[in-house]
């Protein structure tokens, strides 16, 4: 299985080129690049007011207002500090780098900008991890978080004194995707037996899990719910960053591997079809050719 990168590599590579050219003393060039990411997220890298030495990176998330309710603005201020500027029109967050004042740790700055999407997502997880570590449960100053991270797909997060439960709803666009999704989730459950530190993973098809009872969660033949039960060892200060890195990408991870599995199956089917055609071609009998003569002595060939 392949782990998807949590950063946006195109954003990082674009900014790296800008910094390296500036360090080398090359003339600054204008930039206007739009980059797509998972979950309908868009990045926009551009200059401010035509100043080629000022490079602004903006991010647009359709669900950012929901993240703001869980401390997204505060987390970004903590992570980006003076890099934050007023958001560009049509975007939720913007950061600015000055190519005339390059910091010594510019590579770390590039890395942090590439993690903008991850850090926006992190706010809701950190909030509920803190609730759990403080021994607070639902009804004790907090309620379940509901993040509509994609059209018709939702993430739910709630804390109990002994665990944090994260539920992803997802839509399978094809009947085959449901089958492959079930197989994939079964493999995850089997893999947990080999690792006693892995979180509990549950999958429900058509019906939402009990955690979402009476919430109006969607029901349907193409609806699936993936539930993670995170225990204190997953939400502790020293491990929570890795937990967030892995869990916020899970929906994309699942569908990526479903598509890879379908592509592999199709390639195997095409390979088998090619082999069968070769066998049939070898088994085809050669046509019989008979040479005969007429009464006048002319020769003709008859193919049977």
UniProtKB/Swiss-Prot annotation:
Its main location: cytoplasm. GO terms for biological process: actin filament polymerization; Arp2/3 complex-mediated actin nucleation. It holds the Pfam family P34-Arc. The keyword Signal does not apply. GO terms for cellular component: Arp2/3 protein complex; cytoplasm. Component of the Arp2/3 complex. Belongs to the ARPC2 family. PANTHER family: ACTIN-RELATED PROTEIN 2_3 COMPLEX SUBUNIT 2 (PTHR12058:SF0), ARP2/3 COMPLEX 34 KDA SUBUNIT (PTHR12058). Functions as actin-binding component of the Arp2/3 complex which is involved in regulation of actin polymerization and together with an activating nucleation-promoting factor (NPF) mediates the formation of branched actin networks. Seems to contact the mother actin filament. This is Probable actin-related protein 2/3 complex subunit 2. It comes from Anopheles gambiae. The gene is Arc-p34.
